[in-house]
């Protein structure tokens, strides 16, 4: 392809090829470009919701650097099926250092059946793909807001329109829905008492009430109304 071909046209060619191959224009992980990584961090210092933004290689490296520094338990929804393969392929392409992620041991990030990375959807489905469920549906069934704003199918168009903040907000909302379901999971498996679950959930509500951003105001309103 010509080096000066606009991104939109390059992507459309890739979409057309993918539709011909599979009937869907959803690109394989190695062809996905990382625009933002959103995180909820719960530590002894409290709760933080934040996003990593910038050039793709920088965003991915900062994510892996965070694993190196904090060695957190990663919690995702289909992270083993999509998010982490995307990050790993793109890190490989950029020649990045993700050594902590790949560090072997009895508990590591890449083993499906260990805890350092908990793919919540995969675990709840008992590692049977036929039982997989959409984050939005499970979140709403649990009385959470689910997805708001941009839908996943519109992320590319929104990004092309330069509405980066909308993409970031979409990712942050997904991340918080996942975290709130994780709190329920901790109760489900007996790691939390009801009192701890209620306290951790209230911590999220209190944190959101102090964030003066439209997507969090909408999230909190929908949550309170549910």
Predicted regions mapped to residue ranges:
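Acidic, Ser/Thr-rich low-complexity intrinsically disordered segments
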Residues: 206-226
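Metal-dependent phosphoesterase core characteristic of DEDDh/y 3'-5' exonuclease domains
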Residues: 32-53, 67-169, 173-196, 202, ...
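Conserved RNase H-like, two-metal-ion catalytic cores of nucleic-acid enzymes
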Residues: 1-66
């Amino acid at each position: 392809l010509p080096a000066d071909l606009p991104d939109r046209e390059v992507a459309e060619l890739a979409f057309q090829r993918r539709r011909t191959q599979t009937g869907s224009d959803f690109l394989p992980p190695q062809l996905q470009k990382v625009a933002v990584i959103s995180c909820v961090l719960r530590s002894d210092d409290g709760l933080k919701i934040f996003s990593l933004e910038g050039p793709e290689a920088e965003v991915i490296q900062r994510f892996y650097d965070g694993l190196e520094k904090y060695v957190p338990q990663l919690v995702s929804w289909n992270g083993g099926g999509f998010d982490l393969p995307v990050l790993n392929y793109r890190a490989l392409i950029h020649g990045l250092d993700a050594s902590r992620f790949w560090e072997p041991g009895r508990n590591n990030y890449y083993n499906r059946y260990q805890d350092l990375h908990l793919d919540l959807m995969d675990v709840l489905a008992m590692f049977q793909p036929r039982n997989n469920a959409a984050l939005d549906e499970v979140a709403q069934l649990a009385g959470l807001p689910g997805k708001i704003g941009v839908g996943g199918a519109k992320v590319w168009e929104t990004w092309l329109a330069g509405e980066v903040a909308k993409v970031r907000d979409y990712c942050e909302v997904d991340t918080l829905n996942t975290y709130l379901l994780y709190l329920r999971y901790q109760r489900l498996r007996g790691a939390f008492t009801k009192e701890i679950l209620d306290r951790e959930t209230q911590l999220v509500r209190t944190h959101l009430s102090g964030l003066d951003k439209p997507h969090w105001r909408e999230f909190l309103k929908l949550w309170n109304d549910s």
